[in-house]
Structures are given as C-alpha cells and as structure tokens.
Amino acid sequence: MESIDILPVLWPLKGRIRPPGSKSLTNRALIIAALAQGPSHLTGVLDSVDTQVMIDSLGRLQIPVSVDIAQRTFHVNGQGGKIPSTGAELWCENSGTSIRFLTALCAAGSGRYRLDGNSRMRERPIAPLVAALASAGVKARCELENDCPPVQIETDGLPGGRIRVGGDLSSQYLSALLMAAPAASAGVTVEVTGELVSRPYVDMTLEMMRAFGANIHEPQTNHFEIAAQPYVGRTYDIEPDASAASYFFAAAAVTGGEVTVLGLHRNALQGDVKFVDALVRMGCEADWGDDSITLRGKPLHGIDIDMNEISDTAQTLACVAPFASGPTRIRNVAHMRLKETDRVSAVVTELQRVGLTVEEHQDGMTITPGPIRPAEIHTYDDHRMAMSFSLLGLKAPGIRILDPGCTAKTYPEYFTDLDALCRSAR
C-alpha cells in the first residue's frame, strides 16, 4: 500500500492558499445546470473523482458536459427539465452526493434507470429518498433488503404534489428532491419529517436554485414550496471548498502560525466556514475579509461543541484537539457513521493508535490531549481521514498516512498543496 510520511514543521506556518472548488457546490451546479433551459458555464469547478462520477453519469443520461481542466470550467448543455435517455446504468463509486442527487434527477426522466456503487456505497442508506419518490408516484426501490443501493427507478416523470422525506440521516435526500422539483409536472411541496441534520447544506442548495431562477417559498421551517418551471442556464462561479480549507486553518492552529485562505468570506454559501468560529472558541484569532479569511494560531484549550451543522469538519477538529490544554467533546454527529466510513469509530481508533485517550460516544467523542507516538494511520478509503490526520504529523514526528491517494475523491492535490504551504517552515 502506498503511504506518505508527514514531516513536522520547525516553525509556525505562514502562508496563503486558495483551495480547489467546492465539491458540494460543483455537484449541485451540475445537477441544476443539467435541468436548466439553455447552456451553463461553471467556473472555478472541482475536478475530482466525485465530480467525474457526476459528469460521467450525466453523459450516460445524454446530458453533455464539456470539461476544460486547465481553466477549471465545465460547460453544461441544459435540457430544460428533460432527461434525454430513457434508460441508463449509472455507476456512482462511493459518491454520496452523486447517487442521491442523480436518483432524484432520474425520477424526473421517462424510462428505467439503475444506480449502483462500490461495496461501501451498498452500505450507505438511501431508503428515505427512495420512499419519498415512491410516495410521489415514481416506481422506485432498493434492490437489496438493507435500504441501500442499488436503486431502480421506473418513471414517466416526477408528478407535482406533496412529498415527505426524513432528514435525520442526511440532508442530501432533501437537497436531491429540492433540486429535481422544478422539473416536475406541477408545483411540489416538500416537507421534512423529524430532525434535519446539516441544515446549512440545504440553505446552500436553496441559494443555488434561486441563482438559476427557481421559485421557492418556505412558509414554515423545513416546509418548501417549489414552482414547476425550468431553471435558466447561466454563468456560475464555484467557491473554494470550505471543508478543504478547514485543514489549512487547522494547520495554523496546531503550529501557532498564520494562514490566509483566499476566496472565502463570512457570507460564503458553505456553512463549513463556521469551522473558523470553532477554532476561535479554542483560542485562535480570525480576520474576516471581503474575499479571504486569516486564521492565527494561539494557545489552544478544549471545548464542548455541537458539530451537527459542520460535521464534515469534525474530523479536522478531532485532530486539533490533541494539542489543546484540556479535553474536547464533539457532539451530535452520529450521522457521520454513515459517510465514506463510520467516521466516529475510525477517528477514535486512529487517535487511540497514536496513544491518545479517546472516549467514543454514540453521537461523537471526547478527546483528551497527550503525547502523540509514531504510527501508521489507516484511512479507510476516506479522503477526510487522510487529510485530517496529516495535521498530527505537523507537530509530532513519525506519522505515516496510508493510502494517501484516497484524497482524489475531493482534493487530488492536497498533499502537494500542504507540502508547499509547509516548505518555508521546515
């Protein structure tokens, strides 16, 4: 297995970086642009495994996407709410956004579609979305009995009317339905039953839909009314990935350095910019600019924090916590267990591997700071495990990341960019 050794820095980090485009925004923009009337030009996009999966699937649905990697642009020929292909097999690897968004997109088509993924994808629930589509009149079902992919869709279009969907496992089910709704034959009302996790990702979806001309009304919390009218194609710029930025903010925090991330600001679409607030609670200082955020590392103290709304940065914080002066409790992230791996269990296991005392809870963990010993870090085919645990190696010698290539899912150049940022401090 390939590996990479993380070399500790000798001085506090100081630098500037612009992370690649947001995966969450890129895949949402691809879905919306595919349903739009007329062409869309997407700039600042992310080129990664997850976005390549989406583009390949759209191609199989006969929705062409032109890619210019050098310019970081995608050109999408929108189909005005139609799906040209009347039958397709879509392979989604382990891309949760792809399979969930595409399942709802296919429901707006006319024909038979099948969506599948790798072995881990076959363990990730999709039943709440399938049940919501079935209740709307689409013939949708999971092939297996574990409520996970493969998914079969047989449809003659997405009817209008009322759709209810559970939101306690993932907000992506709701986002998928919302984005497909303008292609329905009549207006759609989507209601969330129970708790909704990761609400900022839903807000991101709504803002992007409005940017492409969708008519949305939210008369009460988690109750959405969407008009049946096509999106309008446009030029749309993708923000840098705020989840990816968390690793560079954290690098400043653990080394006592100063890192400026370009292209993000307080009012960014991505809720994960609030990770900066978590680091400020731990003692860091932050400057919010019009098009940048600067984080200065200061002596860290432990905190008790609910990370439900920014759970994609929980692994990052877990790898900052060992350098604090007291324990850190991360709460309300049980849904992380259904991601690329059981992220709660994986983080606990690997922090214990480096000698730390960590208590696992059903909804999170408590991390007690202590000496970090050399170790080979298992990454569980999870890009965020590899990126998060690289932070330990910036201060502690002997940290080796196994399978660093798993970062190709969302950030292929991560270790190159981290090394460039650290070069002046070694």
Regions found by a protein language model. Name each.
Residues 1-426:
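Short, structured segments at the rim of ligand-binding sites
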